[in-house]
């Protein structure tokens, strides 16, 4: 029997959707949560020096999108057809592109940048990125007849985007004036 060990920070984050895929697939796994202090000593032993990492029978794999894609294929959440799989991958790439931009602001916050710098980043980087991200997500949802992002069933793109939008709500960067996105979150 395969042994899965998920290593990720002890917060909601890029490991959350991976956890959800394990639960949806009804697959047991070791959920190894790492504090920021513990991460310092683990970092040099990780494939890319980052978390999350999925260890499968002793083999470590990094990069949340690769892990998510693998598990989604294993448990039936990657799309029903090759075209749907490509659409799901496209939405995951949209999320990753947004996160690259958002990450700059996140690091400024956790590393204690001065308020004026965080406000500048929020105005010049984060808000325009969120606007473009929401425009793209709304277009996808408006084309959908099912309320899911792709096809008629839940995919890991739905999980990833819903988790991300929930995080944006929690940190007060989500605009309530996005009716399609709000309906989407409530659906999931």
UniProtKB/Swiss-Prot annotation:
Domain GST N-terminal residue range list: 2-79
Entry's EC annotation: 2.5.1.18
Catalytic activity: RX + glutathione = an S-substituted glutathione + a halide anion + H(+)
Pfam families (UniProt xref): GST_C_3, GST_N
Keyword Transferase: yes
GO MF term set: glutathione transferase activity
CDD domains: GST_C_Sigma_like, GST_N_Sigma_like
PROSITE patterns: GST_CTER, GST_NTER
Keyword annotations from UniProtKB, A to Z: Transferase
GO biological process, one term: glutathione metabolic process
Ranges for domain GST C-terminal: 81-188
The keyword Transferase is assigned to this record: yes
Functional summary from the UniProt entry: Conjugation of reduced glutathione to a wide number of exogenous and endogenous hydrophobic electrophiles.
Protein name, entry field: Glutathione S-transferase 2
Protein's organism: Caenorhabditis elegans
Gene that encodes it: gst-2
